[in-house]
């Protein structure tokens, strides 16, 4: 009994972390088993890719319709399909598997930059989530979970390489770590360019701190493995275009990038809108603020919708939340920059083993803050932050790495616990900066844990509403299949989930808002639609297509033979050409 207790005590942090990861998995499995979140066309497209991989032996290199976003999520889902069959639940279980991998890798990074207790706190933050955060984790957009996985892997490997740079007994392992770094960088860039800040900054850190290892063969090894990770992209570029226009398979989905009409805003107005969209909408959404003061997307943006006292109060709260996080992030970067510069001088002058270990910790924390900070800056400069900051908040998913790192950084700079517990530092008094860091770490961790816990509970409370919407979609698919409407036209956000949920018995063509035809993300669907006469149209009930359908029917000389309303949500039109 004593031996068992000793074994448990010696591994208590690892056991607790495993329990936290298991709870994170269970919480997410519970959500997806209950049907939350429901599918959309991006999510369903990934499911179709996974089905084609598992059932047809296809090997897509990129997400259908996106020639810059890898297909790793589809392969993960195909693996789950092999055991559970093709379904929305199985698709999202593949995402949960990827997120669990991220949590494991992130723990490997956190224990290198802080204590195991604070690493556990960081894992607890990752286990929880507000509705928007969980939505981004459980929707198969492609590339976002991979950004977390490979970003955390790059940080963990770089931190270990810096820490072991002076240990001659680990030379072979360092070369293996460099190979792993190159492979993670290549696979990450293939999956999504959002990982680029992690690649660039960790590469710079390796060149700065690990030059004896990376020079010559180390660089060759890392670059070779990077190219290996990028090989799917290289193969795609080297492969001749298929007989059908490549655009049918890999062309980007047409999405608006700015207001359709109106006067052109000035440079100052544009910059202000970009910053406000990032600081008031995107950043709070990806850090849990939606729990404490919920808004709908239409209430949150644009600014014209800030008309009621409740909305104005929530926007004010979001301003405080976003501003506080930006200030704390800046504080963490300043503290770590100072720590890295000071400790590097000591290390170059023959510093102690402890100072070298402290250098690796501080460098790791700096990288874990700097890469998401670069992402925030680039996002703020993009049109997405001003035009649709709620939708594109997913671009800031690397904040899931920044938050635990920020807590570790603030806690590390508490007087005698500042980065580098040298004898000289242990005699320092707590300065104002250190007290600020201590208060920030404790208060921020408590607020975030409470907000994210409430967010997880609140997401479970939203299940009933989502299940009602899922039933409407099931009724629509059942109606189409039972009445033989297997070739239909619809709009983008309906098309692909209809195909997926009908097990490809219903194939659809996509119409733009001006009724022009949009090439499918998968060329075979265009061929199937072309073989059938256009007779069935399916649209959301209150949409531009439904509202203008009768006028379009007159213009195109159609006779509306049947109009069916499904659950007061969708309209199904069956038409025939008018007789000459």
Segment roles from a protein language model:
Residues 206-207, 289-358:
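Hydrophobic, aromatic-rich transmembrane alpha-helices
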Residues 2-4, 168, 197-227, 234, ...:
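Perimembrane helix-loop-helix junctions
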Residues 29-33, 74, 88-92, 99-102, ...:
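Aromatic- and kink-enriched transmembrane "portal" helix at the membrane-lumen/periplasm boundary
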Residues 316-327, 354-427, 435-438:
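Hydrophobic/aromatic-rich transmembrane helices and adjacent perimembrane loops
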Residues 172-193, 203-204, 225-230:
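Membrane-interface alpha helices of multi-pass inner-membrane proteins
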Residues 18, 223-227, 351-356, 411-458:
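Signature aromatic-anchored transmembrane alpha helix within multi-pass, membrane-resident enzymes
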Residues 31-41, 54-75, 81-89:
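Membrane-proximal lumenal/periplasmic loop motifs of glycosylation machinery
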Residues 93-114, 153-156, 331-334:
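Transmembrane-helix motifs of polytopic, lipid-linked glycan transferases
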């Amino acid at each position: 009994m004593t031996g068992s207790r000793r074994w448990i005590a010696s591994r208590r942090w690892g056991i607790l972390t495993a329990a936290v990861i298991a709870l994170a998995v269970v919480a997410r499995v519970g959500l997806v088993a209950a049907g939350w979140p429901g599918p959309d066309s991006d999510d369903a497209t990934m499911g179709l890719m996974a089905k084609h991989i598992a059932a047809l032996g296809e090997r897509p290199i990129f997400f259908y319709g996106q020639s810059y976003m890898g297909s790793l999520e589809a392969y993960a889902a195909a693996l789950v399909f092999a055991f559970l069959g093709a379904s929305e639940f199985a698709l999202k279980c593949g995402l949960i598997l990827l997120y669990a991998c991220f949590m494991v890798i992130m723990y490997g990074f956190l224990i290198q930059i802080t204590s195991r207790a604070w690493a556990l706190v960081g894992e607890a933050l990752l286990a929880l989530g507000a509705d928007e955060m969980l939505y981004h984790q459980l929707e198969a957009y492609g590339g976002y979970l991979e950004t977390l996985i490979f970003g955390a892997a790059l940080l963990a490997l770089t931190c270990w390489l810096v820490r072991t740079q002076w240990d001659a007994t680990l030379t072979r392992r360092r070369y293996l770590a460099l190979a792993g770094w190159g492979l993670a960088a290549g696979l990450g860039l293939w999956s999504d360019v959002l990982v680029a800040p992690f690649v660039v900054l960790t590469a710079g850190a390796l060149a700065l701190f690990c030059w004896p290892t990376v020079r010559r063969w180390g660089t060759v090894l890392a670059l070779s493995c990077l190219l290996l990770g990028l090989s799917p992209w290289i193969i795609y570029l080297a492969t001749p275009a298929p007989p059908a226009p490549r655009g049918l398979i890999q062309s980007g989905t047409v999405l608006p990038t700015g207001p359709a009409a109106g006067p052109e805003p000035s440079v100052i107005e544009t910059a202000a809108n970009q910053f406000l969209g990032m600081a008031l909408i995107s950043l709070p959404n990806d850090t849990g603020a939606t729990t404490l003061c919920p808004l709908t997307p239409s209430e949150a943006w644009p600014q014209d919708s800030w008309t009621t006292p409740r909305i104005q109060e929530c926007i004010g709260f979001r301003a405080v939340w976003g501003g506080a996080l930006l200030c704390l992030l800046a504080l963490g970067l300043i503290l770590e920059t100072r720590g890295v510069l000071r400790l590097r001088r000591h290390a170059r002058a023959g510093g102690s083993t402890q100072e070298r270990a402290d250098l690796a910790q501080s460098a790791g924390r700096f990288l874990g803050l700097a890469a998401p900070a670069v992402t925030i800056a680039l996002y703020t400069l993009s049109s997405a932050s001003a035009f649709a900051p709620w939708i594109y908040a997913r671009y800031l998913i690397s904040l899931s790495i920044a938050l635990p790192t920020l807590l570790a950084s603030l806690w590390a700079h508490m007087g005698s616990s500042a980065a580098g517990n040298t004898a000289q530092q242990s005699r320092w008094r707590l300065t104002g900066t250190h007290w600020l860091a201590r208060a920030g770490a404790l208060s921020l961790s408590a607020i975030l844990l409470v907000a994210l816990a409430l967010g997880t509970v609140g997401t479970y409370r939203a299940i009933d509403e989502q299940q009602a919407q899922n039933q409407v979609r099931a009724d629509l698919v059942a109606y189409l299949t039972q009445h033989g409407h297997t070739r239909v036209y619809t709009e983008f956000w309906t098309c692909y989930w209809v195909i997926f949920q009908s097990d490809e018995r219903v194939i659809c063509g996509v119409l733009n808002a001006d009724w022009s035809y949009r090439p499918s993300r998968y060329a075979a669907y265009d061929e199937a639609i072309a073989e059938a006469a256009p007779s069935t149209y399916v649209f959301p009930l209150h949409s531009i297509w439904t509202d203008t359908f009768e006028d379009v029917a007159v213009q195109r000389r159609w006779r509306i033979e049947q109009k069916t309303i499904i659950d007061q949500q969708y309209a199904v039109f069956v038409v025939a050409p008018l007789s000459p």
